A protein has these predicted regions:
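N-terminal small-domain helix-loop-helix segment of the aminotransferase-like
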Residues: 2-109, 116, 290-292, 393
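Conserved glycine-rich beta-strand-loop-beta hairpin in the small C-terminal domain of fold type I
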Residues: 287, 303-312, 322-334, 367
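Conserved PLP-anchoring active-site segment centered on the Schiff-base-forming lysine
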Residues: 120-142
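A short helix->loop->beta-strand "cap" motif at the edges of active sites that frequently abuts
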Residues: 126, 147, 205-209, 233-235
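Active-site phosphate-binding strand-loop segment of PLP-dependent enzymes
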Residues: 150, 154-225
Length: 393
C-alpha cells in the first residue's frame, strides 16, 4: 500500500492565541529543573499554605472515607452539611446572613468560580473590569471566553483602592462584571466598610455585577469583613471565598460563592454542565473545619507574623520598601530607584541566591516596580533565604 505523504497537523483553537501559559506554571518548571540539578531553590513564590488543616478536619476526612456509601456522585449544589457550614461561618465571622439552600454554591476551589461566573454573565464581546495589579486569571479566563478586558488602576498613592473618579468617567455601557479582590492580592491592601459601600453604590448605578474575591480575610487581619455585609449587596454582588488560604487546604480544592438566589441558579446552570460534586468525605471534613475557634486561626497568624518579620528583613536587604499594615499571606515591596528592572532583580536572586521571588509585573503594569514574597514557607527556610540574599554582590 502506498504511503500517504500528507502530514497530519492539527491547529489549536484560536482562543489560545489570546493567552500564554500561566507564569507560575512556567516558572515552577524552571525551579524544578534547578532543583533536579541539585541547586536547592527556596521558593517564596506561590501562596500555598504549608501548615496543615486542623486535626479534627483530617480525622473527619479519614473516618468518613471508610463509609462504603460515600463514594458515589454527590449533589451539584454541595451536600447540606457543607452549605449550612458555610452559612454559619459567614454569620459568625462576617455578620452576614445567607440562606444555605439558595444563596451559597460550593466550588471545586474558587478559581473555577471565575470560569463559571464569566460564562453565566458575560457574552463574547462584552466587557469586564479587572484590577491592575490583580490576579492574572481574571484577565486570562475573560480573554479565553471572548470578553473584552478593561483594566482599572490600583495605585500605591491611593492605597491600592479603586479610583472612583476615573471609573465614573469611563464608558461602562458594555461592562457586565467588575472583579475586586480584598483583602487585596498582591498588594496586601485591606478592605474597609466604606470601600464596600462605594462599590455597591457604583454597581447599582452602573448596572454592573461586582465579584469580590475574598480568600485572605483571616490572615494577619484583625477584623474579617465581607462585601455582602453592605445592605442590598446581594442584589448586585457575588463573593468568592476559599478554604485554601483560611483553613490550610489548598490541595483539597474547596471554595464557595454567595449571592442572591437568582444569580446562584444561573451559575449552577453552568457548573452542573461542567463538573460534579466533590467527594462526600471531603465536604464533611470541610464543614468540620469551618467550626474552628478563634484560637485556631490565631495559631496560624502567630506563625505568619514571625514569617512576615523575616520577609520584611529580606525586603530591606534588597533595598525594597513596604507598607507594614499589609494583610494576607504575602509581602509586597517596592524595588529601589537604583534598580532598573524588577525581573532583572528577581532573576539575579533566583540564579545567584537560589531564592524564587515573584516579580510584580505578572500582576499588571502597576506592579512593574514591585516584588511579592510568599509567607507560605517555614521560618528556617525564610531565614536561610535571607542569609543567601545577604551574600549577593
Amino acid at each position: 500500500m502506498q504511503k500517504e505523504s500528507q502530514t497530519y497537523k492539527i491547529a489549536p483553537a484560536e482562543r489560545l492565541a489570546s493567552v500564554s501559559e500561566y507564569y507560575f506554571s512556567k516558572k515552577l518548571k524552571e525551579v524544578a529543573q534547578m532543583n533536579a540539578e541539585g541547586k536547592d531553590v527556596i521558593s517564596l513564590g506561590i501562596g500555598s499554605p504549608d501548615m496543615p488543616p486542623s486535626k479534627v478536619t483530617i480525622e473527619t476526612l479519614c473516618n468518613n472515607a471508610h463509609d462504603p456509601n460515600g463514594h458515589g456522585y454527590q449533589p451539584y449544589v454541595g451536600i447540606p452539611e457543607l452549605r449550612k457550614g458555610f452559612a454559619a461561618w459567614y454569620q459568625r465571622w462576617y455578620g452576614v446572613e445567607l440562606n444555605p439552600n439558595t444563596e451559597i454554591q460550593p466550588l471545586i476551589g474558587s478559581k473555577e468560580g471565575i470560569l463559571h461566573v464569566t460564562l453565566a454573565f458575560v457574552n463574547p464581546g462584552e466587557q469586564v473590569l479587572v484590577p491592575n495589579p490583580g490576579y492574572p486569571t481574571y484577565t486570562s479566563l475573560s480573554k479565553i471566553l471572548g470578553a473584552e478586558v478593561i483594566s482599572y488602576d490600583l495605585k500605591e498613592e491611593d492605597g491600592w483602592m479603586p479610583d472612583f473618579e476615573a471609573l465614573e468617567k469611563m464608558d461602562l455601557n458594555r461592562v457586565k462584571l467588575m472583579w475586586t479582590n480584598y483583602p487585596n492580592m498582591p498588594t496586601g491592601a485591606n478592605a474597609t466598610p466604606e470601600l464596600y459601600e462605594r462599590l455597591v453604590d457604583f454597581a447599582r448605578r452602573k448596572n454592573i455585577v461586582i465579584v469580590n474575591d475574598n480568600p485572605y480575610s483571616f490572615i494577619l487581619n484583625e477584623k474579617p469583613i465581607s462585601i455582602l455585609s453592605v445592605p442590598g449587596a446581594k442584589e448586585c454582588c457575588i463573593e468568592f471565598n476559599s478554604m485554601s488560604k483560611s483553613h490550610n487546604m489548598p490541595g483539597w480544592r474547596i471554595g464557595m460563592l454567595a449571592s442572591n438566589a437568582e444569580f446562584v441558579q444561573w451559575i449552577l446552570k453552568v457548573k452542573s454542565n461542567l463538573d460534579s460534586g466533590m467527594f462526600r468525605a471531603m465536604q464533611l471534613a470541610a464543614a468540620t473545619a469551618l467550626e474552628a475557634e478563634a484560637d485556631w486561626y490565631e495559631g496560624n497568624n502567630h506563625n505568619y507574623r514571625g514569617r512576615r518579620h523575616l520577609a520584611g528583613e529580606i525586603m530591606k536587604t534588597l533595598g525594597c520598601t513596604y507598607d507594614e499594615n499589609q494583610v494576607g499571606m504575602f509581602l509586597w515591596g517596592k524595588i529601589p530607584a537604583s534598580c532598573k528592572d524588577v525581573e532583572e532583580l528577581t532573576e539575579k536572586v533566583l540564579h545567584q541566591a537560589r531564592v524564587f521571588i515573584t516579580p510584580g509585573f505578572i500582576f499588571g503594569s502597576n506592579g512593574a516596580r514591585f516584588i511579592r514574597i510568599s509567607l507560605c514557607c517555614k521560618d528556617a527556610k525564610l531565614a536561610e533565604a535571607l542569609e543567601r540574599i545577604k551574600k549577593l554582590s
